[in-house]
């Protein structure tokens, strides 16, 4: 059975609360504020844990993007009052890197018109646009992703990306070889692109060893 990476969106009204069972999981705060156990998070902040956690929204409510990794269907949980969950994307990871693994959660920002030259990554992942619009070209197909749109990249397939006419940013989770802790996973396809100035900027939220025992 292949591990499954899921991205869901949780909407919590004021004082809405939900308890999640133990799984490798990253929460990204889109709007509002919430308590993750005893820690308070606001917009653009992240919580990662493999342990069970209870999330409680502040009076402003909260919109949260949540990445989970599980072996098949995750353990069931029940949303409390004032909580609505919508699954955005779910993908079996059929070609995970061999050996020890790494969970990386980060964001990638582009100036208007900025590009990511044709490249690969060393593991699979799910992305979601939080600001602007990004065109992604891969395997002969081109798609434009606006705010809230998510997509999957397997890793080995070459990808070219270009931002629209506004600043653009997406958040992603990738499952990578553990040897890449603290290192970039990007591999440029064309030699001439390696030395070119790069317009994208990275912000790493989570870069930690991953075990599938709890999944």
Question: Could you describe each region identified by the protein language model?
Answer:
Residues 22-35, 110, 121-136, 173-177:
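Short, conserved beta-strand element in jelly-roll/cupin
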Residues 40, 50-81, 155-183:
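Ligand-binding loop in jelly-roll beta-barrel domains
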Residues 184-215:
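Acidic/histidine-enriched, glycine/proline-rich intrinsically disordered or flexible terminal extensions
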């Amino acid at each position: 059975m292949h591990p499954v990476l899921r991205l869901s969106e949780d909407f919590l009204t004021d004082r809405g609360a939900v308890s999640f069972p133990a799984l490798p999981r990253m929460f990204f705060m889109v709007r509002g504020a919430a308590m993750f156990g005893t820690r308070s998070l606001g917009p653009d902040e992240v919580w990662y844990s493999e342990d069970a956690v209870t999330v409680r929204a502040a009076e402003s409510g909260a919109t949260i993007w949540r990445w989970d990794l599980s072996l098949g269907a995750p353990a069931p949980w029940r949303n409390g009052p004032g909580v609505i969950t919508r699954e955005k994307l779910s993908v079996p990871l059929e070609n995970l890197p061999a050996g020890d693994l790494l969970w990386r959660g980060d964001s990638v920002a582009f100036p208007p018109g900025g590009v990511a030259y044709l490249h690969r990554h060393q593991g699979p992942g799910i992305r979601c646009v939080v600001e602007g619009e990004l065109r992604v070209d891969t395997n002969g197909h081109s798609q434009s992703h606006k705010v809230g749109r998510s997509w999957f990249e397997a890793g080995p397939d070459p990808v070219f990306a270009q931002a629209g006419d506004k600043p653009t940013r997406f958040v992603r989770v990738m499952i990578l070889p553990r040897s890449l802790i603290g290192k970039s996973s990007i591999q440029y396809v064309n030699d001439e692109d390696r030395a070119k100035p790069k317009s994208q900027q990275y912000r790493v939220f989570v870069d930690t060893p991953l075990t599938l025992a709890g999944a």
